[in-house]
Amino acid sequence: MAKIINIIGREIMDSRGNPTVEAEVHLEGGFMGMAAAPSGASTGSREALELRDGDKARYMGKGVLKAVENINGLIRDALMGKDATAQAELDQIMIDVDGTENKDKLGANAILAVSLAAAKAAAAFKGVPLYAHIADLNGTPGQYSMPVPMMNILNGGEHADNNVDIQEFMVQPVGAKSFREALRMGAEIFHSLKSVLKSKGLSTSVGDEGGFAPDLASNADALAIIKVAVEQAGYTLGTDVTLALDCAASEFYKDGQYDLSGEGKVFSANGFSDFLKSLTEQYPIASIEDGLDESDWDGWAYQTQIMGDKIQLVGDDLFVTNTKILKRGIDNGIANSILIKFNQIGSLTETLAAIRMAKEAGYTVVISHRSGETEDATIADLAVATSAGQIKTGSLCRSDRVAKYNQLLRIEEQLGEKAPYNGLKEIKGQA
């Protein structure tokens, strides 16, 4: 038995200079796992609660000492002596101790850090890589694939201080034969984009996730510049590389309308879906995330109706990695893909349940980072372990983003042909 003998919580820093929670789970025999919780900037209103101290005299109220105290007290007391390999049992104990719908007593950040640290400790106890242990927990032992990366190379919205309303413009190297090749293609496009921006006298500073954040006149301008960068890097848009957008539309949804203040345009729900569809007709955009507000279910139904057969429509704020909300979407034919962020729901077990539900319904799965990250690379193992097919973990700079890519390189090296890179087949509507 992988008996838990100690649990330690601490406050550490994330990639935006804000505190976050880290946990260690120690087992008999000297085995240990350590994990940190990430934090989002554009968050869905129904996400599990990230517990912050609210003490304005310390980190502007963003301290996490209460969450750390919960780890070192209530959570430690509840899990001492338990078996770290019994992930579902551990997570359920923490959920029961919390006793709230959205984990606002203990904090999803506290529960998640311990949940992931326990999984890492259990993998160490079993003497297997983390991805192998997660695949066991998922009921898919030995079934792996390498994810197609969604690389956020140009930022707007909440992730940058510029005139672009759409939050993320991403490239997906679908023509690559391996993850290693996909990463190289993305890096070359990233550097090509930097030179294109410089040549136009535009800013080459980067946003929270490592993408460039130039002040462009419109969202279409962003797509046009990326097209130039892709071609300058020697690749062909539509075959070697497809594009993906994260609109984060909830951030510019006001009074039932979509206000693109950067462009001086206001759209109705259906009007904004028509606008996005027109972009997909001008550029090879294969995926659109959060193309409407999280509460605009009628709008989502229309968007799915007009684009769902050809474009991957990803629900992030829409579904918040929550099986109850995802089930409603599946039952009503809303979207066709889910973004998975384990801090939205707050435990590994619940995350795996959302992935399984999505896949069983024929939805694609995109494993995602948050804008506030750490060096913790657990999402890389999660993507491979569940054969998710796609991963979204930022640009090709900032070590908090690159840590995940580097872990994927290591995993691909270990697994070889046991973890194929399936390219375009992974993206809904594109196979």
UniProtKB/Swiss-Prot annotation:
User: What is the active site of this protein?
Assistant: 209 (proton donor), 341 (proton acceptor)
Q: Does the keyword Secreted apply?
A: yes
Residues annotated for Mg(2+) binding in this entry: 246, 289, 316
Swiss-Prot/TrEMBL GO biological process terms? glycolytic process
Needed cofactors:
Mg(2+)
EC number assigned by the record = 4.2.1.11
Cross-referenced Pfam families, in alphabetical order? Enolase_C, Enolase_N
Sequence positions that bind (2R)-2-phosphoglycerate: 167, 341, 370-371, 392
Domain of life of the native organism: Bacteria
Task: List the catalytic activities from the record.
Answer: (2R)-2-phosphoglycerate = phosphoenolpyruvate + H2O
Per UniProt, the cofactor note for this protein states: Binds a second Mg(2+) ion via substrate during catalysis.
| GO CC terms in record | cell surface; extracellular region; phosphopyruvate hydratase complex
Pathway noted in the entry:
Carbohydrate degradation; glycolysis; pyruvate from D-glyceraldehyde 3-phosphate: step 4/5
**Subcellular location as annotated:** Cytoplasm; Secreted; Cell surface
SMART domains, A to Z: Enolase_C (SM01192), Enolase_N (SM01193)
Q: Which GO terms describe its molecular function?
A: magnesium ion binding; phosphopyruvate hydratase activity
Keywords of this entry: Cytoplasm, Glycolysis, Lyase, Magnesium, Metal-binding, Secreted
Q: Indicate the quaternary assembly.
A: Component of the RNA degradosome, a multiprotein complex involved in RNA processing and mRNA degradation.
* UniProt-listed PANTHER family: ENOLASE (PTHR11902:SF1)
The family annotation for this protein states: Belongs to the enolase family.
Read off the HAMAP family from this record.
Enolase
Q: What does this protein do?
A: Catalyzes the reversible conversion of 2-phosphoglycerate (2-PG) into phosphoenolpyruvate (PEP). It is essential for the degradation of carbohydrates via glycolysis.
| The protein, known as | Enolase
Q: Which gene encodes it?
A: eno
